[in-house]
């Protein structure tokens, strides 16, 4: 990301602070050069619209027309879900280098806030352990907590804010007021290839219906785009609910929270299909929410 920022006018690289173990907490801001040149003004608009008291409806509409939405994307809060950070780098490279009209339109109409790893400490621990034990009988998932204090439960800290990494993410929310947050995860390897919203029941009754509807609209748009591109294994309204307040900070502050769960690999080892190499992996029967 640092190299892309050096060579492209579409990316700004920033280290927002340090993590529990002293690693950098990175934010990449990606948009058109024109949007990045007026980033302060776009952030000012977001703050005005985030708290519109004193704005007339006409003023609010004018600000919305002048501004562009901010989309906050973060990956690998769970450090054994290694594919997402790798994907972030690929996405950033495409947005920095692709000269197609499609990418130009995206960059003109959105500011993407990218945190490549929400738990950099765990990523270092998991990756170093894999390399240290590669080709030995001890090669397996990192055997200890991959966050020093919270382990896998670091994404249940969005209402207590006990950890440095959570507070660094909250600072991004406070500074930029993004319209959408997207949390990238990985799930089991034998089911669907990707989960997108809408979520299954139960739903937290404290979430405003317009936000649950916004999540559903964005998720279904993602599913439709994937299916139209010939991608198989998309599931929605399944597995993941919207109940616990432990991860609802974004929704309690007026943003749809998009969760994606991608089928897992075995870290950097080959994933062998237990049904046989020539057999499909995962369920093959269509359902209304698994076309």
PLM-predicted stretches and their roles:
Residues 8-11, 23-25, 67-70, 108-113, ...:
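Loop/turn elements at helix/coil->beta-strand transitions in domains of secreted/extracellular proteins
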Residues 162-168, 172-291:
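C-terminal accessory segments enriched in acidic
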Residues 16, 30-31, 117, 157, ...:
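Structured loops at beta-to-helix junctions and adjacent beta-edge loops in soluble globular domains
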Residues 14, 26, 58-62, 245-251:
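Short, surface-exposed beta-strand/loop micro-motifs that present aromatic residues
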Residues 1-35, 40-44:
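A non-catalytic alpha/beta surface segment that caps or lines the substrate-entry region
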